[in-house]
Swiss-Prot record:
Protein name (database record): Sorbin and SH3 domain-containing protein 1
Organism of this sequence: Homo sapiens
Residue numbers spanned by region Disordered: 1-29, 73-158, 214-275, 318-381, 405-534, 628-650, 692-716, 944-976, 1041-1064, 1106-1150, 1162-1230
Subcellular location: Cell junction, Adherens junction; Cell membrane; Cytoplasm, Cytoskeleton; Cell junction, Focal adhesion
This protein's GO CC annotations: adherens junction; cell-substrate junction; centrosome; cytoplasm; cytosol; flotillin complex; focal adhesion; membrane raft
PTM comment text: O-glycosylated.
InterPro entries recorded: Endophilin_SH3RF, SH3-like_dom_sf, SH3_domain, SoHo_dom, SORBS1_SH3, SORBS1_SH3_1, SORBS1_SH3_2
Annotated GO MF terms: actin binding; cytoskeletal protein binding; insulin receptor binding; signaling receptor complex adaptor activity
Length: 1292
């Protein structure tokens, strides 16, 4: 290969200073530098010999390189060296002579490529291009194109003709020390005879010749090393050239195109020497790496054959470009070259990557040889020439070239190149006013590598193309004035700033970083990517990158979504008369982009402090106006910057609900729609408020007749005298906020209620007062309902249409015709209300609302047909809270008329007119009334009205003193059964097996009950001989048919013989009365003490302790009875048991051992040792079985009651009370409600839930409306909630 040709072409082709690439041609001998006055493109399709070239007359044929079209480079005589100063080195001359058979053109092309690889910043072009994967391709031109060159005289400018299809040799070859594989003769420069070489050496001027040494970064001695990678001998030219011109010449884009394989033939034919100055200057100022060959080692674009459209395109532009070049001035051309070169630069890569890719390219080039000569042919502006074989790749490359974006630092005008030249602060900014031509189409100068934009390869190629115009960036053709402005500021701005670190900063030296590269590979680079829009839609002054980087605040997702919503765009055009803002970051506080742009600019220019001062002054004016309204209406004191009284006195001014203002026709700068107003409007719109009727843009139009501060307020006209003061405005705004807050609280409350309703069973804690827990209704129950309940206006009356039987304690039982007062509606199905002083919930379908005008009168029911009146004795004083309640004093005898519900009786006091209802717990029921068609009430033995006030009864007087674990401590005290103990869980009960601490002097309305029959008449108590063989109690002739139930943990007790009976002193005796709810109470009267068997006082403690031990031992010996509900056992009877033929009475054995010992006092057990006639078995306990129930009822009605004596009151009424509650219909009995057996196992999901296993017996205390039950497991003694569909009622 001809090293001469290579050396010369290298110097000129890329237009870069080889010294910047570390090549020291210029440094070696600055005299070698010469100026190229013109670049001529000679489109010769086929150049067989030198004679076929159309050459200028002044061209030196010895300086000609021919090819498929040639570029003639004329060395200007102004910078031309003497012929003697440019002799070829003997080495190079010998090389030419010794290699006649080798293709001179590839060597020339390679040398040019080496020159192009030199970077003005010192970046090694080979490494940069190698990092991009570009492969230089060699045109496969016949070697017979060699020309006989004759040396021209030294006086005429040197003309260097280079083929249009000079292609950079493989970068990989640069990395190797051997010359590239011969690719066939290209005929660039024929083997030049020694004489020709001596006379006029072919060592062409390199760009180092035109670059001052102080601008060449890389050590000049490194050029031979780099050049020697492929053409070591060729790359070194003797130091025979003239010194470089003082002007720092940017390399011409045109020459760079000539030097680039991908820009093959892209050399613009220019005749002016200023173009060369521009060329060299721009190449100094830009990285030559911007022009790599298209192909990468791993590129998806394989080589394509060279096609003639390139030549056609060159011919098309040659004349225009020649004229433009001749008209351009050197400095402006240089600056434009800088501008245009930066965008087309490809990303530099780290030296390591460059070396690897060069090695790859080298190996690939060795293999592919000639087929890679034109990997992707490029036309003059960098567009790859289409090839039928690679049409898809061609389309891809074309699309990316068309849609490239200009890369700029966001802070500056997007039309300024982002690459900075700190070394060139002295570059003047002169505009090219003399370029009248703007091409109608623009193409990028180079084809970026396929990965340059897609896969975030190391760097992005710059986005400014080398167009023929050399002044317009890639995006759009520019007018002359616009380009002048851009070119004028470009160099200064870039030189004044430092480059930003490249994304691959860790792999590059700082000298290889360009600030037009994305910051870092890990940084989101979407803003650097091309948008899918045509480049012709690009508008000056618009840059998405610029606006994106200018965001000075965080944008909320709502704002960003706002502009993207199609409905918003549509309504924006309707409301504002124009499309919505392009970018959401136009929405800045105090600056609403919806408003007209010119208005926004005006307001932004205002001084905020001035506006504040003016507003304050205006507010004072408004206050004065409102205080002393006069005929003269001040002109918009909040608007005009200098408040003044208008000479005209309009009767009305435009106003909103919150502010009354009058806008001057000239739109004074201090108007109410200042920054603060915009901020309010903006916030209102973003928060979902309505857009003002005339749109936000109407608020700031100078011609607008009015303004409003609140975007949601309806506009109307009001008299000027009624303008609101600032205080009123603030107050109304505050009221609106409070209203909004109230709405939010209500919504929150409803949400909480919904959440609570979803799991109403959680946290159920039975309470004496209100069974509807706060957890269920949330904040609604925080309101004091007592006042509402006292006032009739707050409670709406309703009448029950059907009988409603309560299934849980929180439900309110109703009979048809009852009048209830509704407090509130719980949900769509349930009301909460009050009936006869009791509060509860009931279904709305069971009642009918009464009209407010209608007086709430209960329906006249058919009179209750009382078959037999009952009898009771008052145990406590009772003061009725309502008119329907009857007050009485302790000890009074009450005639029972009927049982209103499970907790209330209706009765009257004989001899008086007092009649009403009263709670069962306040009386000892001696005899139950018999009525026709009695109502079956749920058997809740220890329930009472939850709404009963504390004044009606001595509540909780001894609640904390009911139980003591030491029975012996109170041997002589009179103990009473306390129902409250049944509200605690079984686990607690098991810990309190002792006898009650002292007698309960006053019983309270009980807690929600445990199941029925947990307390029994002590007539039926017996000690098991196994548990206490030494002690027996003489009891009536009763045998137990014991079927254990979920609550029974003890075996039946044997009835001991009567000879074990003891007598008790009359003072320690008490008659035993069972009240309606199963409680055993000791009345104050001792009239029946003579009828009781008596025991020695000293034995009471032992009896209790024996009972406790008996129950405990039985529960331990027979644990299977907890789970079994199917076994019956006959109680062992005492030896002296009377009435052996007495009927066996079935009972519900729901009594736990701890319950009995805990709930029964000594006196109660003794008092149950009645005389035989008082404890006859004919007094049933209320069997759980329908059959026994019928039997009991029959006996009861058969005349037992008629023959009853007063002495029998204590024991005989209990069976009646029990049997009355138990009917053949088992659906509502307490046992059904409160004793359940688990069908499935249940694993708790929350802390308050109860674990169930298949077959577990659970004592249910409450059923929640959501289907969950609350109860205690017999097996685990744990208390909690569980799903109701996991259990089934346990029938005994």
């Amino acid at each position: 290969m001809s090293s001469e040709c290579d050396g010369g072409s290298k110097a000129v082709m890329n237009g870069l200073a080889p010294g910047s690439n570390g090549q020291d041609k210029a440094t070696a001998d600055p005299l070698r530098a010469r100026s190229i006055s013109a670049v001529k493109i000679i489109p010769v399709k086929t150049v067989k010999n030198a004679s076929g070239l159309v050459l200028p007359t002044d061209m030196d044929l010895t300086k000609i390189c021919t090819g498929k079209g040639a570029v003639t480079l004329r060395a200007s005589s102004s910078y031309r060296e003497t012929p003697s100063s440019s002799p070829a080195s003997p080495q190079e001359t010998r090389q030419h002579e010794s290699k006649p058979g080798l293709e001179p053109e590839p060597s020339s092309a390679d040398e040019w490529r080496l020159s192009s690889s030199a970077d003005a910043n010192g970046n090694a072009q080979p490494s940069s291009l190698a990092a991009k994967g570009y492969r230089s391709v060699h045109p496969n031109l016949p070697s017979d194109k060699s020309q006989d060159a004759t040396s021209s005289s030294a006086a005429q400018p040197e003309v260097i003709v280079v083929p249009l299809y000079l292609v950079n040799t493989d970068r990989g070859q640069e990395g190797t020390a051997r010359p590239p594989t011969p690719l066939g003769p290209l005929g660039c420069v024929p083997t030049i005879p020694a004489t020709a070489s001596a006379a006029s050496p072919l060592t062409f001027p390199t760009l180092d010749d035109f670059i001052p040494p102080h601008l060449q970064r890389w050590p000049h001695h490194s050029q031979p090393a780099r050049a020697s990678g492929s053409f070591a001998p060729i790359s070194q030219t003797p130091p025979s050239f003239s010194p470089p011109p003082p002007l720092v010449p940017p390399a011409p884009e045109d020459l760079r195109r000539v030097s680039e394989p991908d820009l093959t033939g892209a050399v613009s034919s220019t005749d002016s020497s200023p173009l060369l100055n521009e060329v060299s200057s721009s190449l100094i100022g830009t990285d030559s790496q911007a022009f790599p060959s298209v192909s990468k080692p791993s590129s998806a674009y394989p080589s394509t054959t060279i096609v003639n459209p390139t030549i056609v395109l060159l011919q098309h532009n040659r004349e225009q470009q020649k004229r433009l070049s001749s008209l351009s001035d050197p400095v402006s051309e240089r600056r434009v070259g800088e501008q245009d070169s930066a965008p087309t630069q490809e990303k530099p890569t780290s030296p390591g990557k460059a070396i690897e890719k060069r090695a790859k390219d080298d190996s690939r080039r060795v293999v592919k040889s000639t087929q890679d000569l034109s990997d992707v042919s490029m036309d003059e502006v960098g567009i790859p020439l289409r090839n039928t074989e690679r049409s898809k790749d061609w389309y891809k490359t074309m699309f990316k070239q068309i849609h490239k974006l200009n890369r700029d630092t966001p802070e500056e005008n997007p039309y300024f190149p982002t690459y900075k030249f700190p070394e060139l602060p002295e570059i003047q900014q002169t505009s090219e006013e003399d370029n009248p031509y703007t091409p109608t189409y623009q193409f990028p100068a180079s084809t970026p590598s396929p990965k340059s934009e897609d896969d975030d390869s190391d760097l992005y190629s710059p986005r400014y193309s080398f167009s023929e115009d050399t002044k317009s960036p890639l995006s759009v053709p520019r007018s002359k004035s616009e380009m002048s402005y851009i070119d004028g500021e470009k160099v200064v701005k870039r030189s004044a700033t430092l480059p930003l670190p490249a994304r691959s900063s860790s792999l590059k030296s700082s000298s290889e970083r360009n600030d037009w590269e994305p910051p870092d590979k890990k940084v989101d680079t979407r803003k650097y990517r091309a948008e899918p829009k045509s480049i012709y839609e690009y508008q000056p002054g618009k840059s998405s990158v610029l606006t994106n980087e200018k965001m000075s605040r965080d944008i909320s997702p709502e704002e960003i979504d706002l502009k993207n919503e199609p409905w918003y765009k549509f309504f924006s055009e309707l409301e504002f008369g124009k499309p919505p803002p392009k970018k959401i970051w136009d929405y800045t506080p105090g600056d609403c982009s919806i408003l007209p742009r010119e208005d926004r600019k005006t307001n932004l220019d205002k001084d905020l402090s001035l506006c504040q001062t003016e507003l304050e002054a205006d507010l004072e004016k408004m206050e004065t106006l409102n205080k002393a309204p006069s005929a003269n209406v001040p002109q918009s004191s909040a608007i005009s910057p200098t408040p003044e009284i208008s000479s005209e006195t309009p009767g009305y001014i435009y106003s909103s609900n919150f502010h009354a203002v009058k806008r001057e026709s000239d739109g004074a700068p201090g108007d109410l729609t200042s920054l603060e107003n915009e901020r309010q409007i903006y916030k209102s719109v973003l928060e979902g408020g309505d857009i003002p009727l005339q749109g936000l843009s109407g608020l700031k139009r100078p011609s607008s007749s009015a303004s409003t501060k609140d975007s949601e307020s309806p506009r109307h006209f009001i008299p000027a005298d009624y303008l609101e003061s600032t205080e009123e405005f603030i107050r109304r705004r505050h009221d609106d906020k409070e209203k909004l807050l109230a709405d939010q609280r209500r919504l929150k409350r409803e949400q909480e209620e919904a959440d609570i309703a979803a799991r109403r069973h959680t946290g159920v804690i039975p309470t004496h007062h209100q069974f509807i827990t706060n957890e269920r209704f949330g904040d609604l129950l925080n309101i004091d309902d007592t006042a509402k309940r006292k006032s009739g206006s707050e409670m709406r009356p309703a009448r029950a249409k059907f009988d409603f039987k309560a299934q849980t304690l929180k439900e309110l039982p109703l009979q048809k015709g009852d009048i209830v007062y509704i407090y509130k509606q719980i949900d769509q199905n349930w009301y909460e209300g009050e009936h006869h002083g009791r509060v509860g919930i009931f279904p709305r379908t069971y009642i009918e609302l009464l009209p407010p005008a209608e007086k709430a009168q209960p329906k006249k029911l058919t009179p209750v047909q009382v078959l037999e009146y009952g009898e009771a004795i008052a145990k406590f004083n009772f003061n009725g809270d309502t008119q329907v309640e009857m007050s009485f004093r302790k000890g009074e005898r009450i005639t029972l008329l009927r049982q209103v519900d499970e907790n209330w009786y209706e009765g009257r006091i004989p001899g008086t007119s007092r009649q009403g209802i009263f709670p069962i717990t306040y009386v000892d029921v001696i005899k139950r009334p018999l009525v026709k068609n009695p109502v079956d009430y749920m058997d809740l033995p220890f329930s009472s009205s939850p709404s009963r006030s504390a004044t009606a009864s001595p509540q909780f007087s001894s609640h904390s003193k009911l139980i003591t674990p030491a029975p012996s401590s109170l041997p002589h005290s009179r103990r009473a059964l306390s129902p409250e103990m049944h509200a605690v869980t079984s686990e607690w009960i098991s810990l309190t097996v002792g006898v009650p601490g002292r007698r309960s002097l006053a019983l309270t309305p009980p807690l929600p009950p445990l199941p029925e029959a947990s307390i029994y008449n002590t007539d039926h108590l017996a000690l098991s001989p196994r548990a206490s063989p030494s002690l027996s109690l003489s009891l009536p002739h009763l045998s137990w048919s014991d079927r254990p139930t979920p609550r029974s943990v003890a075996s039946p007790l044997a009835l001991p013989s009567p000879h074990k009976t003891y007598s008790l002193a009359p003072t320690s005796q008490a008659s035993l009365h069972m009240n309606g709810d199963g409680g055993v109470h000791t009345p104050s009267s001792g009239i029946h003490q003579d009828s009781f068997l008596q025991l020695p006082l000293g034995s009471s403690d032992s009896v209790i302790s024996q009972l406790s031990d008996a129950f405990s031992s039985q529960s331990k010996r027979q644990p299977w009875r907890e789970e079994s509900g199917q076994y019956e056992r006959k109680a062992e009877r005492g030896a002296g048991e009377r009435g052996p033929g007495g009927p066996k009475i079935s009972k519900k054995s729901c009594l736990k051992p701890s319950d009995v010992v805990r709930c029964l006092s000594t006196e109660q057990r003794l008092s149950d040792l009645n005389t035989p006639e008082e404890s006859r078995p004919g007094k049933p306990l209320g069997s759980a079985f329908p059959g026994s129930e019928a039997e009991q009822t029959e006996r009861h009605r058969g005349g037992e009651q008629a023959g009853r004596k007063a002495a029998r009151r204590g024991g005989s009424q209990q069976p009646q009370a029990q049997q009355r509650r138990v009917t053949p219909d088992r659906s509502q009995t307490s046992q059904d409600l409160f004793s359940y057996q688990a069908l499935y196992s249940y694993i708790p999901q929350n802390d308050d839930e109860l674990e169930l296993r298949d077959g577990d017996i659970v004592d249910v205390m409450e059923k929640c409306d959501d289907g969950w039950f609350v109860g205690t497991s017999r097996r685990t003694k744990q208390f909690g909630t569980f799903p109701g569909n996991y259990v089934k009622p346990l029938y005994l």
